[in-house]
């Protein structure tokens, strides 16, 4: 994953002044009950959106789960059926120079929901999602592997170029304890 140098500098600066404690340890077992609420950060690429629409089932969300979705205004057109879930969007005015979300109202809106898990479905590095995950206190944070994401996410998935996205997404569902 290619990570811009200005974002690396920003994250270094943020780590210096952030008094964030270590994430709580989690244990994944067959006897676990899974999560009840999940926030998915939706990708901006049209190709990924086709698979994501099926995976997240935005037209008919997973019953018994509180599902939240977040995406940019530009990407919202790729996800037309989002009436049944909490949808959070941001635009270019909500981003800082470092492409991170600066809108305090949006961050507070998401924090109030207190999601059990947050999942970054971007297969490429996304500064907005990485820093949003840094600021949220969900016990389970899942995303694709990168040098920076290893420090932010609880679980990272290594993306192989020849593997199908669907296999990664089914792995994410099993980690969440979601039964289809």
Predicted regions, residues:
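Short N-terminal or domain-adjacent regulatory/targeting segments
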Residues: 2-37, 46-47
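Histidine-anchored nucleotide/phosphate-binding helix
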Residues: 38-41, 45-65
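An aromatic- and histidine-rich active-site surface loop
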Residues: 122-136
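Active-site-proximal region of nucleotide-activated glycan assembly enzymes
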Residues: 1-6, 150-180
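Structural motif
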Residues: 37, 41-45, 72-73, 117-119, 121-123
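Glycine-rich, highly charged phosphate/nucleotide-binding loops
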Residues: 18-24, 89-109
């Amino acid at each position: 994953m290619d990570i811009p140098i200005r974002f690396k500098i920003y994250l270094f600066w943020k780590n210096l002044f952030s008094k964030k404690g270590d994430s709580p340890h989690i244990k994944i077992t067959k006897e676990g009950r899974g999560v009840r609420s999940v926030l998915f950060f939706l990708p901006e690429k049209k190709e990924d959106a086709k698979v994501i629409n099926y995976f997240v089932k935005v037209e008919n969300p997973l019953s018994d789960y509180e599902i939240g979705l977040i995406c940019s205004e530009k990407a919202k057109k790729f996800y037309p059926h989002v009436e049944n879930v909490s949808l959070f969007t941001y635009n270019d005015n909500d981003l800082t120079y470092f492409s991170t979300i600066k809108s305090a109202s949006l961050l507070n809106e998401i924090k109030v929901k207190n999601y059990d898990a947050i999942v970054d479905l971007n297969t490429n590095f996304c500064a907005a999602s990485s820093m949003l995950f840094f600021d949220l206190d969900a016990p389970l944070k899942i995303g694709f592997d990168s040098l920076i994401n290893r420090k932010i996410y609880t679980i990272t998935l290594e993306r192989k170029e020849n593997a199908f996205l669907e296999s990664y997404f089914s792995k994410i569902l099993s980690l969440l304890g979601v039964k289809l």
